[in-house]
């Protein structure tokens, strides 16, 4: 496949990974339901499904890297399609988190009789937003600045500087995750403490999960940059990871204002 390709099709070799990923997701879902209810063998099926799903993700992305780096299949048209796909994926995640913000706003603006007609509900301890949550916010935003630094370094052809910037990104992300764990350990409410606890842990936990995923993306990009896979002409994988990381940064700002600060008043 050459750069002068005139059609927009993303032609790849036949792959077993879509069907294996579907089977892994099915086993994970069924195993999760069996484990929660609980049925015998649920934990085993859940574990096997997760292992199978993670293995499929690893080998599938490995094949994508081979197609782009070694085989030259990712032409400019294909790269454009991958960028569109990344944007649509991030939009779907925005909708997911929007549901949690909606639930929190709906519950706080119109508290029901069951929780005493006040927000936060009477008797529920709340987290001080000006302690760990406030400290964690600039830490995560700084990691976003480091990603931007890495992007400019790649565009300038400065490979070592890009690696250093990605190391800084990952380090700050790990610090953020550690503080998030401390926050959960010290937080007064539990996830079963009325709608307040449920929306608090769903929103912050889902965001924390995204931070972990983004950290893994940044680690992979750092390794690929060190190996010389990323150039100023071809770095779609890094761009997708950077967009994802900036999305996580923006969500953190909304979380701090609406969940930690305003929602905890």
From Swiss-Prot:
It is a multi-pass membrane protein. The keyword Disulfide bond does not apply. It comes from the Eukaryota. It catalyses: 4 Fe(II)-[cytochrome c] + O2 + 8 H(+)(in) = 4 Fe(III)-[cytochrome c] + 2 H2O + 4 H(+)(out). Keywords: Membrane, Mitochondrion, Mitochondrion inner membrane, Translocase, Transmembrane, Transmembrane helix. GO terms for biological process: mitochondrial electron transport, cytochrome c to oxygen. InterPro entries: Cyt_c/ubiquinol_Oxase_su3, Cyt_c_oxase_su3_dom, Cyt_c_oxidase-like_su3, Cyt_c_oxidase_su3-like_sf, Cyt_c_oxidase_su3_a-hlx. One of its GO terms (molecular function) is cytochrome-c oxidase activity. Its EC number is 7.1.1.9. The keyword Nucleotidyltransferase does not apply. It is found in: Mitochondrion inner membrane. SUPFAM superfamilies: Cytochrome c oxidase subunit III-like. Its main location: mitochondrion. The chain crosses the membrane at residues 16-36, 41-61, 84-104, 137-157, 162-182, 200-220, 245-265. GO terms for cellular component: mitochondrial inner membrane. Disulfide bonds: none annotated. Belongs to the cytochrome c oxidase subunit 3 family. Component of the cytochrome c oxidase, the last enzyme in the mitochondrial electron transport chain which drives oxidative phosphorylation. The respiratory chain contains 3 multisubunit complexes succinate dehydrogenase (complex II, CII), ubiquinol-cytochrome c oxidoreductase (cytochrome b-c1 complex, complex III, CIII) and cytochrome c oxidase (complex IV, CIV), that cooperate to transfer electrons derived from NADH and succinate to molecular oxygen, creating an electrochemical gradient over the inner membrane that drives transmembrane transport and the ATP synthase. Component of the cytochrome c oxidase (complex IV, CIV), a multisubunit enzyme composed of a catalytic core of 3 subunits and several supernumerary subunits. The complex exists as a monomer or a dimer and forms supercomplexes (SCs) in the inner mitochondrial membrane with ubiquinol-cytochrome c oxidoreductase (cytochrome b-c1 complex, complex III, CIII). This is Cytochrome c oxidase subunit 3. It comes from Oenothera berteroana (Bertero's evening primrose). The gene is COX3.
């Amino acid at each position: 496949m050459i750069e002068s390709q005139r059609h927009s099709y993303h032609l790849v070799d036949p792959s077993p990974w879509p069907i294996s990923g579907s089977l892994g997701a099915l086993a994970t879902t069924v195993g999760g339901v069996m484990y929660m209810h609980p049925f015998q063998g649920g934990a085993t099926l859940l574990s096997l499904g997760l292992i199978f799903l993670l293995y499929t993700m690893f080998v599938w992305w490995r094949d994508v890297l081979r197609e782009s780096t070694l085989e030259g299949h990712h032409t400019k048209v294909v790269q454009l399609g991958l960028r569109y796909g990344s944007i649509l994926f991030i939009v779907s995640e925005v909708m997911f988190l929007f549901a949690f913000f909606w639930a929190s706003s709906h519950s706080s603006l119109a508290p029901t009789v069951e929780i005493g007609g006040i927000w936060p509900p009477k008797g529920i301890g709340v987290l001080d937003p000006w302690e760990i949550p406030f400290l964690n916010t600039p830490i995560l935003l700084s990691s976003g600045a480091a990603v931007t630094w890495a992007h400019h370094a790649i565009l300038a052809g400065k490979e070592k500087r890009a690696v250093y910037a990605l190391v800084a990104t990952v380090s700050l992300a790990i610090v953020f995750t550690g503080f998030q764990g401390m926050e959960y350990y010290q937080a007064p409410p539990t996830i079963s403490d009325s709608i307040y606890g449920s929306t608090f842990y769903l929103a912050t936990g889902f965001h924390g999960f995204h931070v972990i995923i983004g950290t893994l993306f940044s680690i992979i990009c750092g390794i690929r940059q060190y190996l010389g896979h990323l150039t100023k002409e071809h770095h779609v994988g890094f761009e997708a990871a950077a967009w994802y990381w900036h999305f996580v940064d923006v969500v953190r700002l909304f979380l701090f204002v609406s969940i930690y600060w305003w929602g905890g008043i």
